[in-house]
Amino acid sequence: MKNRVLSLLLVGLLSVGVATAAVKPEVQPVSTPKRVLFVGNSFSYYNNGIQNRVSNLIKSAGKWQAGDNRYRLKTISGGKLFEHIAGIPPLLQNSQKRQWDVMVLQEYSDGPISKKYHQSFVDSSDEIAILARKQGIEPVLFMTWAYKNDKDMTQQLADAYTAQANKLNALVVPVGLAFALAAQTNPEIELYIPDIDGFNETGQEQYNDVLKHPSVAGTYLAACMFYASFYQQSPEGLAYIADLPSAEAKRLQQIAWLTFQQFYKG
């Protein structure tokens, strides 16, 4: 009964424009990649890496095929996509056969909406997409989330990522919209973890006021969103919960699936 009430609440929030994108995706998820390379920064590598969390969901669903499935990560701490460009060709050309089905591109946290870096985001993702497709690899954009105390970023990031994905004729995975929906419906679930700025004279940790990096719950929600997008199936009921409280993981699974339904089908 509680799950049904939450479902109705989430659908209601989505229908009135909470956690939605003004720009609609033109590419629908229709295939299931087996070999996925994530390219990004700390948003992707925090909490043992998004690639491991998605892999564990796939294994939990009984869909992992040893020898066929491969999920890997290429990250630069604090990096932007343009900093990855030089390393892409040698990475893709060190084998006679195609190594990846999909390359997931994750830009710096506010890069797509920053006056300074927006064009860099566009140009870099354009260039990486060309390099990837020359090797038969499809680019996918990783829509990131707003900073915890700057909710206006949600709409801006959603539109920037979706517009660029449409331009590239590529899939975009709406992780940022799932974060926004979770914050609306389950604010007790902490999706962020503070960054340490330094230490005071007594050795106590000093934290940055800007909350942007994902907690384990945040990374798990992102992983559920990728599972839903890559398999076009709900992660609800999967046994892998990343050591989160069971009820919390179930909510995040449900939020990911509802975000999927609204973003791609709404």
Residue ranges and their predicted role:
Residues 35-37, 44-121:
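Conserved SGNH/GDSL esterase-like catalytic core that processes O-acyl groups on lipids
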Residues 19-21:
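Boundary at the C-terminal end of the N-terminal hydrophobic targeting segment
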Residues 92-216, 228:
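Alpha-helical cap/lid subdomain in secreted, periplasmic
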Residues 198-266:
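Conserved catalytic region of serine esterases and O-acyltransferases that act on ester linkages
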Residues 1-8:
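Bacterial N-terminal signal peptides that target proteins for export
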Residues 9-17:
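Bacterial N-terminal signal peptides
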Residues 42, 46, 53-64, 94, ...:
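Structured segments of extracytoplasmic/periplasmic soluble domains
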Residues 39-40, 142:
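Short hydrophobic segments within beta-strands
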